[in-house]
């Protein structure tokens, strides 16, 4: 298989699975050998076993980190700091793309960046949607769920001090009714207290805006 044939096969896919190359009578050993050669030559990136992305200057589409995160762990969605920064709810640039999963926690360092997968209970895997990302798509937590996931995962995350440290902004983008409903799913006093604090911060931000 020539490299040009690989590019034709994957088309505009930002990330591809090695199984895509196994159609027909082609030998799996041959495919593995070719992928290894292209990786060593810097033509493709190996993200994890069986998962690859074409490297510049050959790539047609640069993979969005959120899409890559979804592909690295199928049963996951982007949440916490990464989703909050995406929605403009925190000003900080996040060094790693953070997702939640019912599987084991994991931190992966790849050519596309660092990806963290935090564990939550299976019954808490809700409150996310398919989100458009400049021609790509990925599962991303709703703004309210992203904040609740972070509070749940962070020791002391429900404290006023911690929530102030996040430098939350644009809180008018949060639906407080949705926040309360989703917090009930967690069923913990910590989340209930956090919602009260977030409501307080939202009202304070609104008052400060009126003064300006």
Give the location of each predicted region.
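Hydrophobic alpha-helix position signal
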Residues: 21, 38, 83-84, 183
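Short beta-edge/loop segments at beta->alpha junctions of small alpha/beta modules
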Residues: 1-75, 111
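Hydrophobic alpha-helical interaction segments
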Residues: 128-212
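Generic structural marker for isolated residues within well-ordered, non-membrane alpha-helices
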Residues: 18, 80, 179
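Short coil/loop linkers at secondary-structure junctions
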Residues: 27-28, 90, 189
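Short gly/ser-rich loop at a beta-strand->alpha-helix junction or flexible surface loop bordering the NTP-binding
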Residues: 46-55, 65-126
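Hydrophobic/aromatic-lined pockets within catalytic cores
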Residues: 26, 88, 152-156
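Residues at alpha-helix termini
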Residues: 24, 41, 87, 166-169, ...
